[in-house]
């Protein structure tokens, strides 16, 4: 009998979690599974490509007052999961996890929830509800030990930690030529990414290293605020908001340094990808521990405290003034492409899903 699996996420708009769940669905389809991708929002938007053999199910919006909508939404999701005939449904992100648990109560379908960022932020205002409901999920996937430790022992004991796979064109050989005098970062322009600190730190750094430029790839709600900051600091000729980029590997491959200044992160794909390309990297040591899981401070990158502009300036100056140190960090970082190879990560997912299904 053909194996069947369902995935549930609010939408397929651009984002790290959306990319991972789409690639997981595509992998299982390629392995011969019958795959359903169930979404509940943004039906007209799909940033990432799904395999033609993945069935896309967009849930109709519930009607009625606020209370009725809650119950009708659960009923609609329950029917979609039942219609998929999947013995296991894997859900990603916040409320989708909680809805999947509630929608499958007293069904034979087993639920694996996946937390993709700091749980305290992902479930802000719903912390007690999440900790309670997660006990009824048959499995849970976290990206870091810090995220897993947020939940009670009943959840931790049936969970696993699975990192993100390295996808796309980031497994290419490290660039060995003369590097461009560019500092780069990749991520949506959102307050949690704290690009303000990066821009302010770069403006200070630039006073002593005027040949360097900062390129920020990504777009989002914070763009206007960042443009105003760039104007305020009079660094419009050295700081560039490049917008979304379809060829990130090409854009950053020859850069001298990658910097991540987030206040919180799950497992930061952008940092993993920059490391795999062999770039020297700096990251904040932010919750829920994703950067610290990737970077061994001083060996394959540098970690700095969250929000510490002075530490960032010092780290940038150290790496870009000590070529041997930068070379060491970059070559050590490049090993990430072996550790996070897609075939390894997908097999770990498949093994865990099979284990949960067989419990």
Model-derived features: positions:
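Donor nucleotide-sugar binding/catalytic pocket of nucleotide-sugar-dependent glycosyltransferases
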Residues: 135-171, 185
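Short hydrophobic beta-strand element within catalytic cores of glycosyltransferases
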Residues: 280-285
């Amino acid at each position: 009998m053909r194996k069947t699996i369902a995935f549930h996420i609010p939408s397929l708009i651009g984002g790290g979690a959306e990319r991972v769940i789409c690639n997981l669905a595509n992998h299982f389809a390629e392995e011969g599974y019958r795959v359903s991708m169930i979404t509940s929002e943004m039906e007209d938007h799909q940033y990432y490509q799904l395999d033609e053999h993945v069935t896309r199910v967009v849930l109709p919006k519930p009607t009625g007052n606020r209370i009725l909508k809650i119950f009708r939404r659960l009923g609609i999701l329950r029917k979609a999961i039942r219609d998929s005939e999947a013995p296991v449904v894997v859900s990603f992100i916040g409320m989708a996890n909680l809805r999947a648990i509630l929608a499958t109560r007293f069904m034979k379908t087993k639920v694996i929830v996946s937390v993709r960022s700091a749980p305290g932020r992902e479930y802000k205002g719903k912390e007690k509800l999440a900790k309670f409901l997660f006990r009824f999920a048959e499995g849970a996937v976290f990206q870091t030990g810090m995220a897993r430790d947020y939940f009670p022992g009943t959840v931790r004991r049936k969970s696993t930690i699975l990192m993100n796979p390295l996808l796309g064109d980031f497994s290419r050989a490290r660039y060995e030529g003369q590097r461009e005098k560019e500092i780069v970062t990749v991520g949506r322009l959102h307050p949690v990414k704290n690009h303000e600190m990066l821009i302010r730190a770069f403006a200070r750094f630039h006073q002593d290293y005027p040949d360097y430029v900062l390129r920020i790839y990504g777009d989002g709600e914070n763009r206007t605020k960042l443009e105003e900051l760039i104007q305020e600091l009079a660094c419009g000729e050295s700081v560039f908001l490049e917008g979304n980029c379809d060829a990130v590997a090409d854009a950053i491959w020859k850069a001298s340094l990658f910097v991540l200044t987030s206040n919180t992160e799950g497992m930061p794909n952008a940092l993993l990808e920059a490391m795999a390309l062999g770039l020297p990297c700096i990251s904040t040591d932010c919750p829920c521990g994703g950067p610290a899981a990737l970077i061994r401070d001083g060996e394959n990158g540098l970690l700095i405290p969250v929000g510490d502009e002075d530490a960032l300036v010092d780290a940038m100056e150290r790496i870009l003034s000590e070529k041997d140190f930068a070379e060491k960090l970059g070559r050590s970082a490049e090993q990430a492409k072996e550790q996070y190879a897609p075939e390894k990560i997908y097999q770990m997912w498949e093994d865990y899903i099979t284990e949960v299904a067989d419990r």
